A protein has these predicted regions:
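Divalent-metal coordination cores built from histidine and acidic residues
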Residues: 1-10, 15, 90-201
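Histidine-rich, glycine-flanked metal-binding segment
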Residues: 1-20, 25-73
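Hydrophobic alpha-helical bundles that form the membrane domains of multi-pass transporters
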Residues: 13, 20, 41, 97-99, ...
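Divalent metal-coordination and catalytic microenvironments
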Residues: 24, 45, 68, 79, ...
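Di-metal (Zn2+ and/or Mg2+/Mn2+) metal-binding site signature of metallo-dependent hydrolases
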Residues: 69-92
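Short beta->alpha connector loops
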Residues: 88, 177, 207-210
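Functional cores that coordinate and move charged inorganic groups
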Residues: 189-220
Length: 220
């Protein structure tokens, strides 16, 4: 929680930045313009100031001259199954980071269907070795709909409880088993409960045209 105090002090110049990038062209995605001569002050891995950062520079500050190069916020991919591309997170990063994607929210559903929780852990550990900021959801439906397909593993509520404690897990993966949600099936609702107990998010996946009672039951 002290990071907010640090950011304020750096922005005001009371505490000097660790790094300042000077003389950049900022792609301002809020105003849809290119702003010339912009500096960025950084401390504790966070941006403290965007603008004129001369007052943020101290004797120990690393100063990088962007020399008019463009800087922009990184793209965040809000939902992806990396393993569907038949590559690892590291190889995926090589393809997307140069194009501006710096973060992903991945749902390793497919590898979990084959390898179970260990497959999810492999994906998370692989992501830590890549330049991507990769956040993961715990796969919720393994198999996707019980009784309709065979899988190499099955995920139950106690597995969700465990995965919610893992570093890198941000929530519950897309809940594709909408028949079991609206039908109040025990294990599915236990998975939802374990996610809520851990104060994490639940992601949805409702794919039938019933926008009446069924949709309301799913959302509720």
């Amino acid at each position: 929680y002290e990071v907010t105090r640090t950011m304020a002090r750096v922005a005001m110049g009371v505490q000097k930045a660790e790094t300042v990038i000077k003389n950049a062209r900022l792609v301002n995605v809020c105003t849809a313009e290119i702003q010339e001569g912009i500096d960025v002050a950084i401390a504790e891995g966070r941006i403290a100031l965007v603008g004129d950062a001369a007052h943020c520079i101290g004797p120990e500050t690393t100063v990088i001259d962007a020399n008019g190069q463009y800087i922009a916020p990184g793209f965040m991919d809000g939902h992806i199954h990396v393993e569907s591309s038949m590559i690892s997170v590291g190889e995926y990063a090589k393809a997307v980071v140069p194009c501006g994607t710096t973060g992903i929210f991945m749902d390793p559903h497919e590898i979990c269907n084959v390898c179970g929780k260990e497959g999810v852990r492999i994906m998370i550990e692989d992501a830590k070795r890549s330049p991507l900021k990769a956040m993961s959801n715990a796969p919720s439906c393994v198999p996707a709909v019980a009784g309709f397909e065979d899988t190499g593993a099955a995920i139950r509520a106690d597995d969700i409880r465990e995965m919610m404690t893992w570093d890198g897990i941000m929530g519950l993966g897309e809940m594709m088993s909408f028949p079991n949600v609206i039908g109040a099936e025990d294990n599915i609702h236990a998975e939802l409960a374990e996610t809520l107990k851990s104060d994490n998010i639940i992601t949805g996946h409702f794919s039938i045209p019933d926008t009446g009672a069924a949709l309301n039951a799913y959302i509720a």
